[in-house]
Amino acid sequence: MAAALRASTLFLVGFLIGVVVTRLPLSTALPILVGAIPNAWNVLDSSWRYTARTDGEVLNITYGLADRRRQSIRLDRIHAVQITQPFLWRPLGWYEVRVSVAGYGASASGKASGSTRILPVGTLAQARQFLPADAAPTYASPARAKWVSPLDYRQQTVALTGDYVIVRNGRLNRRIKAIHTSHIQELTYRRGPISQALGLATVDLDLVQGPVRMAARNLTLADATALLARLRSRQLPGLKPPR
């Protein structure tokens, strides 16, 4: 059911109805169907009978409809976590969890070397098990940020709790992202022409390659500078011997 409520699947269903109602020529409809059907199938196949269990320092994942697949991820290689609630999932209280894993960069074919979805669909309580303890926002976008982010500016917040950074954004599709400060690769302070005129700045948190992208967007100059200073003083991990 969760797969059916994804935008790509709804598009496919709506398109098929449109083909019947409008009698769209097959020569026009076929290329669109060829592109849409594989995506809908991938969503269903990668979510079917999905289980994720921890065994010591390893997260074991099993999933698949046509072909059962198994995958093991060392917990210390999970660098960032993202909880997403698509707009259509809100009435059902469903959430999805994805992670960025060190060493899961894209291959030559453009595909990641392993699954980064560790909870295809679950409750908020289940999703929060992958996050540090929640905290009140430390920084938030001011009201004038509505000129550059009219939909999301009220939801754009950053919380610093212990050694973690938690970023929230998204009004339609809600997202919560978290990372241990030691896993931040680089920090980038940026201001575009409009942001300069509004007295705003964004701090990008550069992470390992993966689905999680983090940025403290459209903060006041004082807040962006303070956040940058605090994160620059983070404790960096020492070199570890290879396992």
Regions found by a protein language model. Name each.
Residues 1-243:
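N-terminal basic, Ser/Thr-rich segments that initiate or prime the first beta/alpha elements at protein or domain
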